[in-house]
Swiss-Prot record:
<comment type="subunit">
    <text>Homotrimer of disulfide-linked HEF1-HEF2.</text>
</comment>
<feature type="glycosylation site" description="N-linked (GlcNAc...) asparagine; by host">
    <location>
        <position position="47"/>
    </location>
</feature>
<dbReference type="GO" id="GO:0046789">
    <property type="term" value="F:host cell surface receptor binding"/>
</dbReference>
<feature type="disulfide bond">
    <location>
        <begin position="223"/>
        <end position="275"/>
    </location>
</feature>
<feature type="disulfide bond" description="Interchain (between HEF1 and HEF2 chains)">
    <location>
        <begin position="6"/>
        <end position="569"/>
    </location>
</feature>
<dbReference type="Pfam" id="PF02710">
    <property type="entry name" value="Hema_HEFG"/>
</dbReference>
<keyword id="KW-0812">Transmembrane</keyword>
<dbReference type="GO" id="GO:0019031">
    <property type="term" value="C:viral envelope"/>
</dbReference>
<dbReference type="GO" id="GO:0039654">
    <property type="term" value="P:fusion of virus membrane with host endosome membrane"/>
</dbReference>
<dbReference type="Pfam" id="PF08720">
    <property type="entry name" value="Hema_stalk"/>
</dbReference>
<feature type="disulfide bond">
    <location>
        <begin position="215"/>
        <end position="302"/>
    </location>
</feature>
<keyword id="KW-0261">Viral envelope protein</keyword>
<keyword id="KW-0378">Hydrolase</keyword>
<dbReference type="GO" id="GO:0019062">
    <property type="term" value="P:virion attachment to host cell"/>
</dbReference>
<feature type="region of interest" description="Esterase domain-1">
    <location>
        <begin position="27"/>
        <end position="137"/>
    </location>
</feature>
<dbReference type="GO" id="GO:0020002">
    <property type="term" value="C:host cell plasma membrane"/>
</dbReference>
<feature type="glycosylation site" description="N-linked (GlcNAc...) asparagine; by host">
    <location>
        <position position="130"/>
    </location>
</feature>
Length: 641
């Protein structure tokens, strides 16, 4: 008896329809193209080989209580330049009896976890009871210059020329000694013959190189005394106080001149010392001061200014019973590009009250890893381009954009059945997708990879099949390209309108960045909608072609036992070919059909400039589908007599 056997696609109510460019699909499941990621609190780095840390006892491997005394792992401690009791500011000024460590090193990303050793608890005087405002200014300049340099180093001995009449001085309020920088020089005079002494003229040189470290810019402390009145300084009738630094052209670059500037007018009778942080290029500088006292710059921090990079500052405070300041926090928050890591609880140590805090260890544990994105909100190492909340700037790397979960396109999954659908040139498929029309919104900086997403996704039709036609794909991508040009033009117009706002309002800069981020997110979601439609269409056509390949395989296996009367249908004599014979031909000895297909490999690589301010967005899109070994599922064998 002759019977008719056909391959028949079966779809029931459990399937959902997915429309695409070039073909449609029925699927039993669906999944979002990406999930939302949540940043991890604390610090991390983009590249383990290109960062360096500067620290103190909490990152010092040589501390006798290490690792219990540390807030970082052994791996991370190896990246730090640290010494117990040290700080960058202590090494800059060198107060008597304090640790003096030569801080220097190179790295694109710099992490600073130091500062606590110069705080109110240290009780450093030297003509100044409270150094917090100077510390704030010092740390701010360090973070600013570090963000523009690959290498930095303390220069602990500047070449100088001191006037013969001046000798090194000491102060009772400085442990009967004085700072190493500035150094105090005094003139001993014998009234009345020489009651005032001579004006001081000294010179110092900022080098272009210190050891192996290139110096294109120096951070120098310009220190001078502040007198409340002329009478306080002028007890000997020696005119007004002044201490001024000049560059080689005679321009004033630092200091105080009470010959032209008023005294404070307060009622005190003891001077205080002020130190301004000034940024100077290498060269020879002169210092002129009124008789009796000279404060001489003898140290600097030098920076090569060769590479911009992230800066992370970690809150550096004492545990209980010791007074801290928050200069590090304030300095970082007021410095563009500086990410601040802050505790939420009081510092509670393991080794003692001040070393080995568990919360800080957790916040710094990310330094052991590489992240795709680092930001003030935390760090992300997942590949998804979307996060639920807007990541606060500064941020560096490939940072996800804020999006709502329901706005992320879904792709078919599970059991897939192809059906005919629309062509790539059709702008309104039967079921509208989130696609090209949604793209023309807001601001967008976008660049498609050189080959175009079609280079990864579609390609030209070959003899063996696979993909939609080359002509159809080209028309579709030509439309995408034209729409992107419209977006670019709209972006330029919008930016020009915002220029005036930015020049007059700093808040506008922050508003603009948020506006651009939102527009980028909308545009990226639109691009994903296009990719989803292309994926669906490409899979649909690939599955249909695989059906014909399956039919050809059946015909070949049947040989003369079955005659193909139409695509996917055969006539067979069951008297000649029994059930086991039919199973061999149509079921491949129970090995087909299989219940699943190879998974889709859909990757979005979001690339941005490494610096957040003024960055542009590049969108590199790759989407690949493996159809080479695809075996169709969801196929029933229909038998009729």
């Amino acid at each position: 008896e002759k019977i008719k056997i056909c391959l028949q696609k079966q779809v029931n109510s459990s399937f959902s329809l997915h429309n695409g460019f070039g073909g449609n699909l029925y699927a039993t499941e669906e999944k979002r193209m990406f999930e939302l990621v949540k940043p991890k609190a604390g610090a991390s780095v983009l590249n383990q080989s290109t960062w360096i840390g500067f620290g103190d006892s909490r990152t010092d491997k040589s501390n006798p209580n290490f690792p219990r005394s540390a807030d970082v792992s052994v791996k991370t401690a190896n990246k730090f330049r640290s010494l117990t009791g040290g700080s960058l500011m202590l090494s800059m000024f060198g107060p008597p009896g304090k640790v003096d460590y030569l801080y220097q090193g190179c790295g694109k990303h710099k992490v600073f976890y130091e500062g606590v050793n110069w705080s109110p608890h240290a009780a450093i005087d030297c003509y100044r009871k409270n150094w917090t405002d100077i510390k704030l200014n010092f740390q701010k300049n360090i973070y600013e210059l570090a963000s523009q340099s690959h290498c930095m180093s303390l220069v602990n001995a500047l070449d100088k020329t001191i006037p013969l009449q001046a000798t090194a001085g000491v102060a009772g309020n400085c442990n009967n000694s004085f700072l190493k920088n500035p150094a105090l020089y005094t003139q001993e005079v014998t009234p009345p013959x020489x009651k005032c002494g001579k004006e001081n003229l000294a010179f110092f040189t900022l080098p272009t190189q210190f050891g192996t470290y290139e110096c294109r810019l120096h951070l120098v402390a310009s220190c001078y005394f502040i007198y409340d009145s002329k009478e306080v300084y002028n007890k000997r009738g020696c005119d007004n106080y002044f201490q001024v630094i000049y560059d080689s052209s005679g321009k004033v670059v630092g200091g105080l001149d009470n010959r032209v500037s008023p005294y404070t007018g307060n009622s005190g009778d003891t001077p205080t010392m002020q130190c301004d942080m000034i940024q100077l290029k290498p060269g020879r500088y002169s210092v002129r001061s009124s008789p009796r006292f000279l404060l001489m710059p003898e140290r600097s921090y030098c920076f090569d200014m060769k590479e911009k990079g992230p800066v992370t500052a970690v809150q550096s405070i004492w545990g209980k019973d010791r007074k801290s300041d928050y200069a590090v926090d304030q300095a970082c928050l007021s410095t563009p590009g500086c990410m601040l890591i802050q505790k939420q609880k009081p510092y509670t140590g393991e080794a003692d009250d001040h070393h080995g805090d568990q919360e800080m260890r957790e916040l710094l544990s990310g330094l052991d890893y590489e992240a795709r994105c680092i930001s003030q909100s935390g760090w992300v190492n997942e590949t998804s381009p979307f996060t639920e909340e807007y990541l606060l700037p500064p941020k560096f790397g490939r940072c996800p954009l804020a999006a709502k979960e329901e706005s992320i396109p879904k792709i078919p999954d599970g059991l897939l059945i192809p059906t005919s659908g629309t062509d790539t040139t059709v702008t309104k498929p039967k079921s509208r997708i989130f696609g090209i029309d949604d793209l023309i919104i807001g601001l967008l900086f976008v660049a498609i990879v050189e080959a175009g997403i079609g280079g990864y996704l579609l390609g030209s039709r070959k003899e063996s099949g696979g993909g939609v036609t080359k002509e159809s794909a080209e028309k579709g991508f030509e439309k995408i390209g034209n729409d992107i040009q419209i977006l670019r033009s709209s972006t330029n117009i919008a930016i020009e309108k915002l220029n005036d706002r930015i020049s007059h309002d700093e808040q506008a800069i922050r508003d603009l960045t948020l506006e651009i981020e939102n527009a980028r997110s909308e545009a990226l979601l639109g691009e994903l909608g296009i990719i989803r439609a292309l994926l669906v269409g490409n899979i649909s056509i690939g599955l249909q072609e695989s059906l014909w390949e399956l039919a050809s395989e059946i015909t070949n296996r049947a040989g003369d036992l079955a005659v193909e009367i139409s695509p996917g249908c055969w006539i067979i004599d069951n008297n000649i070919c029994d059930q086991s014979c039919q199973n061999f031909i149509f079921k491949f000895n129970e090995t087909a059909p299989v219940p699943t297909i190879p998974p889709l490999d859909t990757k979005i690589d979001l690339q941005s400039d490494p610096f957040y301010w003024g960055s542009s967005l590049g969108l590199a899109i790759t989407a690949a589908i493996s159809l080479a070994a695809l075996v169709i599922s969801g196929i029933a064998i229909c038998r009729t007599k």
